[in-house]
């Protein structure tokens, strides 16, 4: 990160040049605190909600004495708690990766899917189901992460150029790699008859989350989130334009490289844990801009917290819509996200970075 530290002092004047603060510092802190409380409350609500029942009293007793948990308490401990934590973490990761992706490409329609992460993960999950059909779910998780990494490396290899202006090349490379890996995934699934077994994962679901997979991937998500927060001031500089960012002492290519690393770690870990969940990384950053403006030092943390809230509440709804059966939360988020996306698109202000 030594290279990224260059120009930190110069970046301090970005807010005056952007003129995009929509809230004062106290208002921003209030919004941040409200989102933290809302995220905590929604996660507790998720643990206490289900067809087997539950209450805050049982939740508190289970947290205080997990060894004594039984009945509903055991369901909370072994099934609902890892699911709620995974929803919060992956929702934060999807939204934060979307904000970072929009920052490094300077494209308000970008999200992690632009790097082919979902397509790469899906292709490798299909391969793992064919090659290791009896393997535990952790193998599928590792395969998904490996596929996401391969997709990002392919996009970066095709999209990187000799000049600083690489955003358009990345977009084209991402679209091409996504189309290729999606086609390969569909061909393999049809050829080996595994379409049905992969459909629930590809639609996005938190039903298969375990403490084991959560413990393996949560350090990745938390570390990448911290790196994304460190990048936020450089993303604000990049939003002014590549030449302006360079004049402020920001190494554009290095910021873009670290930004892609953040997106890979966040979205790759999340997709491997809960499957492909679209629209959170695209829509949540736009909603966050309406609250705190376009400065990424405010946009990144607010997007992360709001993404966690959105996915936790969506998962609660997905569990209760057709109880006792699970509705894929990715499908529900997409259904709710489309009208929100159109509403944001046709705002008079437009979608500005």
Residue ranges and their predicted role:
Residues 2-353:
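Alpha-helical transmembrane segments in inner-membrane proteins
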